[in-house]
Amino acid sequence: MPSSPGNRQHSLRSACERCRLHKLKCTILPQKRFEGPQEAPEQCTRCARAKAKCVFGRRAPPKHRASSSNDRSSVSKGINSTTPATRTMQPNATGFVSSHRIELPPSPASNQSSLKHSSVWDNLLDKTTPQEPRADFSSFSYPPVPFDLQSMCLDEVDMAASALPTTEPNFSSAQREHEFSAMSMSPGLGYDNLDELLALNEQPNISDASSPLLSETDPSHGMIRLSSLLKEIHETQHNLQERSFSCTTSRGLAGYPIGRVLHAAQTFSSMVTNLMRPRVVQTSHTDVQGFNPSLYSSSPESTELPSLHQEFVSSLEQMKTNALEQSRRLGEDDLDKYASPCSSTTSLQDTMLDMPIVMLVFCCFASLSKLYCSVFRFFEKSLHSQSCRAKDSTYVPPLQDTRTLQLGELSIENDTEFKVLKALRMLLDAFQAAEASLGLPSSLTVLNSNKSTISASAEPAVSDTGSLQHHLRHSLIKQCVTFDDRHLERTLTSLVTHVENLKQLLRVQNGLH
């Protein structure tokens, strides 16, 4: 006998609570299946295997059935008792069934004429006809969203109440799309159009000298690397001046960044060495059809790059002519003494040593000399402050680290003196390698030999280190640029003075004077 609706609503579930919780299929043995709506098996196969408690719950009454029963009870109370029941159930009556009947619009596949002449759509389009309360169809469309910072970042931006707009703009969807496309394609600040911004992004980054896009055969590669090195030297100089390193404690000396100075000197040496390497020049013979046999040749023609001295001497003949013309105009007849006979016809335009690269080499070498002077000045202050304190013989360096630069053996009994001597040796080796890459003699040795003839108030004497300034002077005269040709020599003289002072302090503090 089939069960009643009440029994069906509260019947047992077909799966136990444990299987429903784990979302597993609840299987029951054939001999333990449901025999009736009120009878449940003892255990399912999963609970029996896990030795867990198996509970079969009952179904809750459906919500739609409960709501329909409540509606029927409330409607039945509102029906007029004088209306006969037979008249209420007629299809043309105005009772419960006719008042709650919903006429759906035609399907999309129907004819458009039926949609136009439908009574439902006529009532919806006719605003003068009183209608029953219906759902607001305008709620299905997106509300007007103001396209401003207030609505987009209201929770993240702290905006004053006076700056908020008093009226809310109402943009249509087309206007919102136009404003969004205009904002996404607007050029950056400071540029008139998008082409300038794209052209700026295509320019190489000078700060990245190790970019894989740069080639060694590219003429601009040397300029970019030298510009990056010059920027690094000036930043190191600025950091050493801004940061206050204590010269009275060993900890302040240990934290002094001489590694940056060594890196700058070693990088300068490697860059100048790369500029002196032979340059490969390929001769291309292109026919009418555009065939280039040099691109498929495995043995391109190569020419050796002349040295820095030979390259400048090759262009002295033309420089001499320009200098003589300038001296006739200005009345300076002493420019002729700087010129020398030309022994070669190689042009600077055929090599990588063009005028901007020579200028950058000169600036890097001069800036590196100033950086060394500031480092040695700090070492002098450290040794002066150390001489005023009592010596602590708590650190004994190994035997291989006690050799000196020029004085033989030094019995260093202090940690500060050992660090200064070690740093001085490393820095001088790197600086002499930088001078050797330029083809110059050691300025420390040459200027030291002439130091007896140089006084503190007199002008520094001209030494062999003026060979670089000699060539640079001719190059700069060609470009109509004037500069102090003895500025670098004065810097090197100051550098030698600092080195001699450091050596003298080491002699005095170790009893070797």
From Swiss-Prot:
Residue range(s) of DNA binding per entry: 16-54
Chain positions covered by the region annotation Disordered: 58-92, 97-116
SMART domains noted in UniProt: GAL4
Bias (Low complexity): 67-76
InterPro entries: Zn2-C6_fun-type_DNA-bd_sf, Zn2Cys6_DnaBD
The protein, known as: Varicidin biosynthesis cluster-specific transcription factor
Keyword terms, alphabetized: DNA-binding, Metal-binding, Nucleus, Transcription, Transcription regulation, Zinc
Function, as annotated: Transcription factor that regulates the expression of the gene cluster that mediates the biosynthesis of varicidin A, an antifungal natural product containing a cis-octahydrodecalin core.
Compositionally biased spans, kind Polar residues: 77-92
GO molecular function: DNA binding; DNA-binding transcription factor activity, RNA polymerase II-specific; zinc ion binding
Organism lineage string: Eukaryota, Fungi, Dikarya, Ascomycota, Pezizomycotina
Coiled-coil ranges per UniProt: none
Keyword Nucleus tagged: yes
Gene Ontology cellular component list: nucleus
Cell location: Nucleus
